[in-house]
Structures are given as C-alpha cells and as structure tokens.
Amino acid sequence: MPTNNHVQKEKFAEDRALLSQQNKEYAESLAKDIAKKEEKDKIRFEAEQKELRKKTIQDYREKLKGTVSQGPLRLLVRYPNGSRLILSFSPSQPMTSLFDAIILNPACPDYFSVRSVYPRAEIHCYPAWYHTIFNAEFKDETEKGANNVAKETNEVKCLETIPNNSILYVNLIQ
C-alpha cells in the first residue's frame, strides 16, 4: 500500500509534468502569435511601400504634363492596350527623354519594358529613380536571377541607339 508521502510525490511529479506541458504549449502559442504579427506587419509594410512607389510614378507623370519634344528622329510607340503614339526627338536628347515621353501617355502601365521591332532589342531608357523603384517592386524575381528588365540607362543619345522611324513596343511587366 502506497504511503501518503509516496502519493504526494506522485501528485507533485504529475503537477510538475502538467505545468511543464502547459508552459511548453504556451511558449509554442506565443511563438505562433508573434510570427503571425510579424507576418501581418511585413505585409502591411510591403503594401505601404508598393503604394508609395505607385504614388512616386504618378507624381512624376504629373510633373511631366505639358512637356513636348520635337526633332527629326521619329518613333512609333505601341502600348499594351493597342494604342499608338508617334514621338519626335532631337538627336541630342538623352535616352531618358524617351522614357519621359512613354510614361506620360495614360496608356502606359506603371511597370514596363521597351523593345524595338528591328533590330529586336531591349531599349534601356530608364532613369535611376525608376530603376530603383522597378527593382524594389520585383525584388523576388530579381533575387531569383530573373532578367532585370529595367536597367538604368547611361546618358546615351537617342539617335545613337535607335534608328529613325523605328517601332517600339511597351510591354507590361507584372
């Protein structure tokens, strides 16, 4: 027959095991709650950053309104929705002038690439600020080694890189 002291020791051991199990479950639950909160905060932060990038692009478009470029270099630009725009440039204008003229059109998506039809090539006309925003928006793809479409341009002149009367396609990047 177990003694009273032996019963107390068993009861104490059971209580201690129960308390240990409860502490373990509490710690696991707390860790899950912290992870959920961190994930929620991360999603909220990323959404805020995405909205800030979109606002930066919209503000840039507003700043450009009313600017017109003219010159002997003519380019036909086709947008993803099928609309077309004929642009004229001076041979001395930098490549970023092409970016400005393309992004100013309401048919232009926020994130895009520009390709020429012939010769088939990527046209890098992006200013540094857009390059940064683009890479932030698509950081997962660029980290996986995907082709970095929005490569920053150097100040190469339009005429040196794009033949007159070229057709350029603006491609939506998602």
Curated annotation (Swiss-Prot):
Record's subunit section: Forms a complex composed of deubiquitinating enzyme atx-3, adapter ubxn-5 and cdc-48.1. Interacts with atx-3 (via C-terminus). Interacts with cdc-48.1 (via N-terminus) and cdc-48.2.
Coiled coil: 8-58
Tissue-wise expression: Specifically expressed in the germline.
Domain (UBX): residue spans on this chain: 74-120
The organism of origin for this protein: Caenorhabditis elegans
Pfam families (UniProt xref): UBX
Function: Probably acts as an adapter for ATPase cdc-48.1 and/or cdc-48.2, conferring substrate specificity. Unlike other UBX domain-containing protein does not bind 'Lys-48'-polyubiquitinated chain.
Keywords, sorted A to Z: Coiled coil
Protein name (database record): UBX domain-containing protein 5
CDD domains assigned to the protein according to its UniProt record, in alphabetical order: UBX
